[in-house]
Curated annotation (Swiss-Prot):
Taxonomic source organism: Shewanella loihica (strain ATCC BAA-1088 / PV-4)
UniProt keyword annotations, A-Z: Antiport, Cell inner membrane, Cell membrane, Ion transport, Membrane, Sodium, Sodium transport, Transmembrane, Transmembrane helix, Transport
MF terms in GO: sodium:proton antiporter activity
Gene: nhaA
Highest rank taxon of the organism: Bacteria
Protein name: Na(+)/H(+) antiporter NhaA
Location in the cell: Cell inner membrane
Catalytic reaction(s) noted: Na(+)(in) + 2 H(+)(out) = Na(+)(out) + 2 H(+)(in)
InterPro entries, per database record: Na/H_antiporter_dom_sf (IPR023171), NhaA (IPR004670)
């Protein structure tokens, strides 16, 4: 189990560094003579037509609706494994990261709404600073190498997984519009078939893939965000077969490098390019970017620390063995690294009348995430022992 966790963390850490490179490249492209090429490429129309089925979207929408469905499938597989056998499988293990994640979602949303309470168009972005980018956070932590105890990495991992689950619920409840009854019925039938496959003990992944594709198309057409199909498929794939093998873990291990080194960097490159040329100081200090940046930089650590402190004082949770508040505090700051997850919610929140706020939102995400990464890194570096020393 420990080896699996170490492998997971090493992949996520390397992926976080690659994500940083993708964000930097996107910013360079968006603010150079290549800007037109960058935007034109992302808005290239791509159509798939099979009989009466017609899916016509720009490349950036294929990335956000299609590739990210695979990423959310991986999240679903991770959540299922951790709930049944991993770091969230017992109340003692799950309590602290659960309370921390809840606080870390409430406080950033509240701070954002304080700055945007008067504008109903920008209010819809309240969930943007509530997310944590697990790959980026672990990537920053990886820069400190073996000085970081595995227990601290597992705490951040568990917190981020619960945070991701919260994001899934938020997307389902608040960012689904113009629902199609027929598509929802087809999606429901697909879910029934997936559950039936699970109950019948079907461990071959191909049937889940075929029905899962139907589910993804139905959800895409229904008005509910298509990425949720990935989570549903993941929850239906068996964790254990009768012979002791794990179809779920096999798929998770197969998806992980693709998600870490292909899907998320492509998503970051497609969504992080903010054109700064037309922005004024007033734009930079407007409610949307300020609310997001402060939500990530202040709201995240305040929520994580306050809810964790109260839970420990009420004996509802306990600190990880060998860890103190001086270790938890900089990790709480690192939870303010929103990046890809925050950008994903931003792409759902600011559409239609609010589309003009998209660049401002991404600017706030980049500002808050970078500041959280820098402060969290140096703070954690200061409290951790040097190599060869004991904490």
């Amino acid at each position: 189990m420990e080896k699996a966790i170490r492998n997971f963390l090493s992949q996520e850490s390397a992926g976080g560094i690659l994500l940083m490179a993708a964000v930097i490249l996107a910013m360079i492209m968006a603010n150079s003579p290549l800007s037109g090429l960058y935007q034109g490429f992302l808005h290239t129309e791509m159509q798939v037509r099979v009989g009466s089925l017609d899916i016509d979207k720009t490349l950036i929408h294929w990335i956000n609706d299609g590739l990210m469905a695979l990423f959310f499938m991986l999240i679903g597989l991770e959540v299922k494994r951790e709930l049944l056998e991993g770091a969230l499988s017992s109340r003692e293990q799950a309590s602290l990261p659960t309370f921390a994640a809840i606080g870390g979602m409430i406080f950033p949303a509240a701070i954002y709404l304080i700055f945007n309470y008067a504008d109903p168009i920008t209010q819809v972005g309240w969930a943007i600073p509530a997310a944590t980018d697990i790959a980026f956070a672990l990537g920053i932590m990886a820069l400190l190498g073996s000085r970081v105890p595995v227990a601290l990495k597992v705490f951040l991992l568990a917190l981020a997984i619960i945070d991701d689950l919260g994001v899934v619920v938020i997307i389902a409840m608040f960012y689904s519009t113009d629902l199609s009854a027929i598509s929802l019925v087809v999606a429901a039938l697909a879910i029934v078939i997936l559950v039936g496959l699970n109950r019948k003990g079907v461990t071959a992944l191909a049937p889940y893939g075929v029905v899962g594709l139907i589910l993804w198309i139905a959800v895409l057409k229904s008005g509910v965000h298509a990425t949720l199909a990935g989570v549903i498929i993941a929850f239906c794939i068996p964790l254990r077969a009768k012979d002791g093998s794990s179809p779920s873990e096999h798929l998770e291990h197969s998806l992980h490098p693709w998600s870490t080194f292909v899907i998320l960097p492509i998503f970051a490159f497609a969504n992080a390019g903010v054109d700064l040329s037309g922005m004024s100081l007033g734009d930079l200090l407007s409610p949307v970017p300020v609310g997001i940046a402060l939500g990530l930089l202040l709201g995240k650590p305040l929520g994580v620390l306050l809810f964790s402190f109260v839970a420990v004082k009420l004996k509802l949770a306990a600190l990880p063995e060998g860890m103190g508040w001086r270790h938890i505090a900089p990790v709480a700051v690192m939870c303010g690294i929103g990046f890809t997850m925050s950008m994903f919610i931003s792409s759902l929140a600011f559409i239609g009348d609010g589309e003009a706020y998209g660049d401002l939102a991404r600017l706030g995400i980049l500002t808050g995430s970078i500041m959280s990464a820098v402060i969290g890194y140096f703070w954690l570096s200061k409290v951790l022992p040097e190599k060869g020393e004991k904490s």
